[in-house]
Amino acid sequence: MMMVRRGLLAWISRVVVLLVLLCCAISVLYMLACTPKGDEEQLALPRANSPTGKEGYQAVLQEWEEQHRNYVSSLKRQIAQLKEELQERSEQLRNGQYQASDAAGLGLDRSPPEKTQADLLAFLHSQVDKAEVNAGVKLATEYAAVPFDSFTLQKVYQLETGLTRHPEEKPVRKDKRDELVEAIESALETLNSPAENSPNHRPYTASDFIEGIYRTERDKGTLYELTFKGDHKHEFKRLILFRPFGPIMKVKNEKLNMANTLINVIVPLAKRVDKFRQFMQNFREMCIEQDGRVHLTVVYFGKEEINEVKGILENTSKAANFRNFTFIQLNGEFSRGKGLDVGARFWKGSNVLLFFCDVDIYFTSEFLNTCRLNTQPGKKVFYPVLFSQYNPGIIYGHHDAVPPLEQQLVIKKETGFWRDFGFGMTCQYRSDFINIGGFDLDIKGWGGEDVHLYRKYLHSNLIVVRTPVRGLFHLWHEKRCMDELTPEQYKMCMQSKAMNEASHGQLGMLVFRHEIEAHLRKQKQKTSSKKT
């Protein structure tokens, strides 16, 4: 039994060994039959059990690595060549720009584009800050102030006329005309932009433009302040634009409501009843009937003719149902500075806009809005340049009669001049007048106190708006320079008197009148002798 069992186990062992050998043989045959061949014999991978398999793998890998390394090196060389060519082209372009700018006299920064753009924006904003848009700049003298010019759609009102230009004229130069048109169009584009639109928004056109003022500072740029009609009565739209010798920059877009802005017109007076009667006729028409937001303060010196002045006020009050006036009587010698100072301090209401005026001033209702729009408490005071009328007796000497006053108020070179040396007419809030210290009451006689106050504002941080206005006139009256004046005051008085009489050409005709008459007599004699 044991022998049989041993034989069976030996037989089974041999069968298992044979099966294992058979499986191994089949596996070897399968590997030999299914080994992949390359397209080329030298790229065929050797078998793992081959005696050269390891060396073959290393050789093929080294060859592939070398090919990859060569390809990468080639790409790097091409990229480097492209970078070098791009840098060379950029340098050529930059040098060309610098040469062009140098030829034009410009100095451009050769910094990277990002830095250059940032520096440019910073520079433009610094130009806006230096242009007295948000705050005033302290100035040494009144001659350092840069005045504004004013303009409408048709006319420009300018200070610098020379011998060929006119105080009021249509802009003849194309660059000036295009400049102002561009400013108005830029403002209209802003007003009609989607950001400004609202459910009740209406389109703005050039007909809504009222007036603008502008001034150019050669080291900064041009500042524009444009005023448009608002959506309601007594409402306005004002846009402040700045051209820093380049594109216009929008600085502010303000909505201004002047419906409740009261103006206190202060007039110092002594005698001059006829002039006061004429002034009150203008005041009634412009302030009471048209504007309706004005208070009148009359500061009267002395008692002579005081009843006549009071009678004119009372008659105007009854006829126009006007009660907004104050009459202050002072003793002593007339002093314009003292009268204005007392009138300003006498006001007991809230902060009010003051208009320092004279009895020989004519103004329109449009000027009153100009006064409101160019003042702001704690920030801005208005010193308009008025148009001063020449002596009508000289201007219209060749006419049969002098025309009515309204027909005389024409802004032309032959009829008057911009009184750019006068600082008496001014609009400023009472708080600013008090804070600046008011007038210097130690100054006696003619002139001086106005310039002193003006200089104090120039030395402060308030913005001083100085511009000619088309609705403010100084009516001619004979000027007497008293012997009691100091030499400096007397000189100023005589200069003012000479300026008030006539234009340069008209005065020349008066100076050479005798020569002209002699020439006419000779011509007449020659004509008579030829006839005989």
UniProtKB/Swiss-Prot annotation:
Stretches assigned to coiled coil: 57-100
Annotated TM spans: 15-35
GO biological process: cartilage development; chondroitin sulfate proteoglycan biosynthetic process; dermatan sulfate proteoglycan biosynthetic process; endochondral ossification; extracellular matrix organization; heparan sulfate proteoglycan biosynthetic process; heparin proteoglycan biosynthetic process; proteoglycan biosynthetic process
Tissue: Ubiquitous, with the highest levels in placenta, thyroid, bladder, prostate and adrenal gland. Detected at low levels in the other tissues examined.
Effect after changing residue 264 to S: In SDJLABA; reduced GalNAc-transferase activity
Enzyme Commission identifier(s): 2.4.1.174
Record key words, sorted: Coiled coil, Disease variant, Dwarfism, Glycoprotein, Golgi apparatus, Membrane, Metal-binding, Signal-anchor, Transferase, Transmembrane, Transmembrane helix
Residues that, per the record, bind a divalent metal cation: 360, 477
GO molecular function, one term: glucuronylgalactosylproteoglycan 4-beta-N-acetylgalactosaminyltransferase activity
One GO CC annotation: Golgi cisterna membrane
Cytoplasmic side: 1-14
Lumenal compartment spans: 36-532
Major localization class: Golgi
Domain of life: Eukaryota
Impact noted for substituting residue 509 to R: Found in a patient with neuropathy; uncertain significance; loss of GalNAc-transferase activity; no effect on protein expression
Mode of membrane association: Single-pass type II membrane protein
Localization terms from the record: Golgi apparatus, Golgi stack membrane
InterPro entries, per database record: Chond_GalNAc (IPR008428), CS_glycosyltransferase (IPR051227), Nucleotide-diphossugar_trans (IPR029044)
Gene3D superfamilies membership: Spore Coat Polysaccharide Biosynthesis Protein SpsA, Chain A (3.90.550.10)
Changes after translation: N-glycosylated.
Recorded catalytic activity of this chain's protein: 3-O-(beta-D-GlcA-(1->3)-beta-D-Gal-(1->3)-beta-D-Gal-(1->4)-beta-D-Xyl)-L-seryl-[protein] + UDP-N-acetyl-alpha-D-galactosamine = 3-O-(beta-D-GalNAc-(1->4)-beta-D-GlcA-(1->3)-beta-D-Gal-(1->3)-beta-D-Gal-(1->4)-beta-D-Xyl)-L-seryl-[protein] + UDP + H(+)
Function: Transfers 1,4-N-acetylgalactosamine (GalNAc) from UDP-GalNAc to the non-reducing end of glucuronic acid (GlcUA). Required for addition of the first GalNAc to the core tetrasaccharide linker and for elongation of chondroitin chains. Important role in chondroitin chain biosynthesis in cartilage formation and subsequent endochondral ossification. Moreover, is involved in the metabolism of aggrecan.
Family stated for the protein in its record: Belongs to the chondroitin N-acetylgalactosaminyltransferase family.
Disease implicated: Skeletal dysplasia, mild, with joint laxity and advanced bone age: An autosomal recessive disorder characterized by skeletal dysplasia, short stature, short long bones, advanced bone age, joint laxity, and facial dysmorphism.
Protein name (Swiss-Prot/TrEMBL): Chondroitin sulfate N-acetylgalactosaminyltransferase 1
Species name: Homo sapiens
Designated gene of the protein: CSGALNACT1
